[in-house]
Amino acid sequence: ADEFISRCRDFSRLLKEYHPNAEMWPSAQQPHSIPNWGEKLISELQELPDEIDGIITGPNHAFEMDELRRRVPAKYPIRFYPDITHNVRCEYPVHFDRDDWHYALAAGLSRECTNPRPCEYREIHRLTRRYVVGSVSYSEGITDDVNKCVWSDMDFFPDVDVRDSLE
């Protein structure tokens, strides 16, 4: 994480020479091969480098959202990069709040089939939005259009009714 933040800082300085209003938002996603990466990232951010403008978090995160917000200095806003595409082996598996997908469907349809989950993603958005300053939802194409529509609508209108988003 120290080398990662160092490179982000160097790149940020160079970038701002040509684009003074550009911002640097490194990702807090943890590489699987570095178990203590999250702790090192927090340690680097404790130094409050001015070249860093905010943090992004998403799948493979080092910390749960509430813990990340507690540990990252308040100077840095957090933007969310949620995975609204995948059904299994992902950030929010289909059984996020209940075990409701039959094994045959999970095994047969797998990770990337069409599976609109507007009510579930509305609930996830409500649970996470207090920790972040917005989001850019992860999408892999047409299998998640409904989820993307609902999530994006809630970024702008947090209290919108799901039915209104879908209409």
For the regions a language model picked out, list residue spans one by one.
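Catalytic-core regions of glycoside hydrolase
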Residues: A1-E167
